[in-house]
Amino acid sequence: VIREFDAARYDFTLREEQTHEIIEDVAHMKSELGILYLSEHNREVIERMLAANELVFEGLFCATPHVFVCADHPLAGRSSVTLEDLEDYPFLSYEQGSYNSFYYSEELTSTFERRKNIRVRDRATLFNLAMGLNGYTVCSGVISHELNGPGIISIPLDVDEYMEIGIITRKNTTLTRYGQAYIDAIRQHI
């Protein structure tokens, strides 16, 4: 998207944040838009927060859960995995800070108890731990090999859940051409 505009000057900020920070940043106009997901576990709480902050959610796509693992993970050759298959491996998740409720969790299966847990703040650390410790995280399955390389792969997770990934924006506002181009790029990628 940045190359698309080929401007002599620009000032973009791309943040990877906790769920509540995404909502706060869009509500307080620190960010033009945010990307998050809704599930049967978090939908009611997140929609209530969005309404209270005069934000709207626009679904981009629905996905069945997948896991990200390193390409040489012992389960990498499987066509799908179960939560039981993953029991011996470290579960990597995003820290939610003082908003520790599973309603803010970035992972769909946050209510499932695990023996090995590691919480991180950013994707680079998560991917490094996935490769170094044979860890895994639960995700939408969308990955850019152009950005992340071939070291991380996605495997379908055999659970009866879904995630609706979408954008949040302020009510009654129009996106800038940069914001719209970003969303268009996401739509093309999925």
PLM regions: where:
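Central regulatory/effector-binding core of bacterial HTH transcription factors
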Residues: 1-45
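Hydrophobic hinge/microswitch elements
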Residues: 18, 27-32, 37, 96-153
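Short hydrophobic/charged patches on amphipathic alpha-helices used for structural packing
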Residues: 23-27, 57, 83, 126-127
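Secondary-structure junction motif
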Residues: 39, 43, 83, 87-112, ...
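Beta-alpha-beta core module
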Residues: 45, 52-58, 62-64, 124-173
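Flexible hinge/capping segments at coil-to-helix
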Residues: 49-91
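Short helix-loop capping/hinge motifs at secondary-structure junctions, enriched
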Residues: 72-81, 159-161, 172-178
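Extended ligand-binding regions for polar small-molecule ligands
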Residues: 84, 164, 168-190
